[in-house]
A protein has these predicted regions:
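A gly/Pro-rich, aromatic-decorated transmembrane alpha-helix motif that marks the paired
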Residues: 12-15, 19, 115-118, 161, ...
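Short helix-boundary/capping micro-motifs
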Residues: 86-87
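Transmembrane helix-bundle core of multi-pass membrane transporters
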Residues: 2-77, 101-103, 124-129, 176-185
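Hydrophobic residues within membrane-embedded alpha-helical segments of Major Facilitator Superfamily
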Residues: 5-7, 64, 108, 112, ...
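Transmembrane alpha-helical segments in multi-pass inner-membrane proteins
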Residues: 107, 112-113, 123-186
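Short hydrophobic alpha-helical segments within the ABC transporter permease transmembrane module
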Residues: 97-108
């Protein structure tokens, strides 16, 4: 359902426009250019201090990871999701409303996909049909590296965060080294 929904959304977007659409909304651009400056940083060749910063997309993503981690670990909904992911038949026999929980999970999935698209647009300040093509496989591989089982029932958002960091580090190292073939990285 989720991949089919993605392909449907991508197709509908292609009907609207196949050109890149730059975002010119002032509030959106303020958000995109905002920085959370840190008290540390580096100096340039002239000795001028350049503070380190964190973009708002990283802050929002970290807040979402923490909220989802708490939801999955300490709330009934999260425990139901783990039970259904582990074994749907057992969850049904325990008296859990599997259909309702799955429906709620798809609602949460849709919200998080929309938020991810918003954060992606904050980074690029533009929208394009082919912009995030192939990132679904990056997301799946990062989750697996972080310890999530594709069969379900096992995995944490914090583990997935570490999977994203590990995959990003490996991709960056391969790109900057330039010693491996181009098919190793997108």
């Amino acid at each position: 359902v989720t991949l089919a929904g993605m392909f449907f959304g991508r197709g509908m977007t292609a009907i609207i426009s196949t050109d890149m659409i730059s975002i010119k909304n002032e509030l959106f651009l303020k958000w995109a250019n905002y920085r959370f400056y840190m008290p540390f940083g580096s100096t340039n060749k002239k000795g001028k201090f350049i503070p380190a910063y964190i973009p708002p997309t990283v802050v929002i993503a970290l807040i979402v990871v923490i909220i989802i981690a708490v939801l999955l670990k300490y709330r009934k909904f999260g425990r139901k999701l783990y039970a259904i992911g582990g074994n749907r038949q057992s969850a049904l026999m325990m008296g859990l409303n599997v259909k309702k929980t799955m429906f709620q999970a798809y609602i949460l999935d849709g919200f998080l996909a929309g938020l991810g698209g918003f954060l992606f647009c904050l980074n690029s300040c533009a929208g394009f049909v082919e912009q995030a093509k192939g990132l679904e496989m990056d997301a799946i591989s990062s989750a697996v590296i972080g310890g999530t089982l594709l069969s379900g029932g096992v995995g944490t958002p914090i583990g997935t965060l570490f999977g994203v960091l590990i995959k990003g580090t490996i991709s960056s190292l391969i790109t900057t080294q330039g010693t491996l073939s181009s098919w190793w990285v997108r």
